[in-house]
């Protein structure tokens, strides 16, 4: 199935099987196995969707690996079809050939997972066992991993030496309805107290006692919860960010990958700020975005600042690999139906149309510790019947960055500029999750409504 809308329907039965398996394992008291099964389910939609697209990896090594995988997989599929249609006299020979082909493919995938785990996630569902995940966490960090079932919400709360599961009876349809109302009211700056209380009661309150001792919490959402601004949830008598710094990841496997890439990279101290690219229409100008980019020099005096007609897609694609911190203040375009065409809008020129799409980002080679996407809805991706969110964030992680700061909705220009200023200022001596928390508190002291400060979130690892 090549068309994504049809493909999501095709995956519905697969995902319902994952759901039933998670529920069955939980009912049997096998919370650890249920978690690991949930983790496997997160990558399935991403892999199947990419199977319908031609992604061009950034390095020749990656291209060669994908070509090798495709050749080995095609051999398995061809022999499988021949075996199914073979006469009895031919079946034994074909069965042996098929067994050899499957063995070769399996050995290749095992090697690819060891050498290049992120690339392997394009062709096989990665597995992240609990013990390996816990080794990544320090004493002040916990994870909350969600799985939305049709009639309950599951949350695993994981620390370096702790593992608990919380099950809350609430229908998925109710979560979807309340979250939709909440986001509409939020973006209109309306009263959100009722929806805020309901969502916090489902998402945070049941796990509150299990977060004791943590200074930061990693959120791994599921399905529609990717669209939830967790920094605006309630904890006790205040917001969760009054006590805890937050970071996000689409899956536990992505956290492992960002840690591994951080170790492998030679860190660059160079900073690039891109602001208000010339998109050919005055109506698309973002004056505060240009100021925002220029003010990066307040925190990083040697930063390269590129704005207006100079901020072309061609220039960015050619030079982005040189920088350790990259800040892009521009429009973002979220394509719900074709997520690989979601884009950061840059200036067009004679070589490129200016749309730095998800598809194109997969082909870049980036060595940045941090990419900040100060644009409209850059953090959103398509959440289908599978879960692994396909958006700009995942593409930038694959291309090489460890952390992405991005937005869930159209964020107010002035409030964003203030938040970004404090975020970079707070990075000195703090991890980035804490730097963002402090920046959100600063903005909240001036602009009380969560629409001003809860839209930006940090995805990847927290360091």
What are these regions (language model features)?
Residues 1-239, 263-278:
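Amphipathic alpha-helical protein-protein interaction segments
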Residues 93-96, 100, 223-225, 260-333, ...:
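A domain-level signal for caspase-like cysteine endopeptidase catalytic cores
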Residues 161-164, 170, 180, 222-288, ...:
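Boundary/activation segment at the start of structured domains
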Residues 252-255, 264, 324-422, 426:
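Catalytic cores of nucleophile-dependent amide-cleaving enzymes
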Residues 414-463:
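An often Trp-containing, charged/polar helix-loop segment at the C-terminal end
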């Amino acid at each position: 199935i090549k068309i994504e809308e049809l493909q999501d329907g095709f995956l519905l039965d697969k995902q319902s099987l994952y759901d039933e398996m998670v529920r069955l394992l939980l009912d049997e008291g096998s919370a650890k196995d249920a978690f690991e099964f949930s983790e496997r389910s997160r990558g399935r939609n991403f892999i199947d969707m990419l199977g319908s697209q031609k992604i061009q990896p950034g390095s020749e090594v990656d291209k060669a690996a994908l070509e090798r995988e495709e050749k080995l997989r095609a051999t398995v599929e061809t022999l499988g079809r021949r075996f199914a249609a073979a006469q009895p006299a031919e079946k034994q020979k074909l069965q042996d050939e098929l067994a050899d082909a499957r063995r070769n493919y399996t050995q290749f995938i095992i090697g690819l997972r060891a050498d290049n785990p992120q690339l392997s996630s394009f062709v096989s569902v990665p597995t992240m066992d609990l013990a390996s995940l816990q080794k990544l966490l320090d004493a002040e960090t916990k994870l909350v991993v969600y799985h939305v079932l049709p009639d309950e919400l599951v949350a695993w709360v994981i620390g370096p030496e702790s593992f608990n599961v919380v099950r809350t009876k609430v229908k998925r349809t109710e979560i979807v309805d309340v979250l939709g109302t909440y986001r509409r009211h939020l973006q209109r700056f309306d009263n959100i107290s009722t929806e805020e209380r309901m969502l916090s009661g489902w998402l945070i309150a049941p796990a509150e006692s299990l977060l004791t001792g943590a200074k930061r919490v990693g959120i791994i959402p599921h399905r529609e919860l990717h669209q939830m601004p967790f920094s605006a949830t309630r904890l006790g008598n205040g917001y969760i960010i009054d006590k805890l710094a937050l970071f996000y990841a689409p899956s536990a496997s992505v956290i492992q990958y960002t840690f591994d890439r951080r170790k492998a990279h030679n860190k660059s101290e160079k900073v690039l700020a891109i602001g208000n690219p010339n998109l050919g229409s005055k109506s698309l100008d973002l004056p505060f975005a240009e100021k925002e980019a220029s003010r990066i020099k307040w925190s990083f005096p040697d930063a390269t600042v590129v704005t207006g007609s100079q901020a072309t897609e061609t220039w960015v694609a050619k030079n982005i690999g040189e920088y350790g911190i990259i800040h892009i203040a521009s429009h973002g375009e979220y394509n719900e139906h074709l997520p690989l065409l979601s884009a950061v809008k840059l200036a067009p020129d004679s070589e490129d149309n200016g749309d730095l799409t998800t598809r194109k980002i997969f082909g870049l080679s980036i060595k940045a510790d941090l990419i900040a996407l100060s644009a409209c809805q850059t953090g959103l991706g398509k959440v289908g019947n599978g879960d692994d969110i396909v958006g700009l964030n995942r593409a930038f992680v694959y291309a090489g960055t460890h952390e992405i700061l991005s937005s869930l909705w159209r964020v107010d220009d002035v409030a964003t500029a203030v938040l970004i200023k404090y975020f970079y200022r707070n990075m000195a001596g703090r991890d980035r999750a804490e730097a963002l928390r402090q920046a959100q508190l600063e903005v909240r002291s001036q602009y009380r409504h969560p629409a001003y400060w809860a839209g930006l979130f940090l995805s990847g690892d927290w360091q």
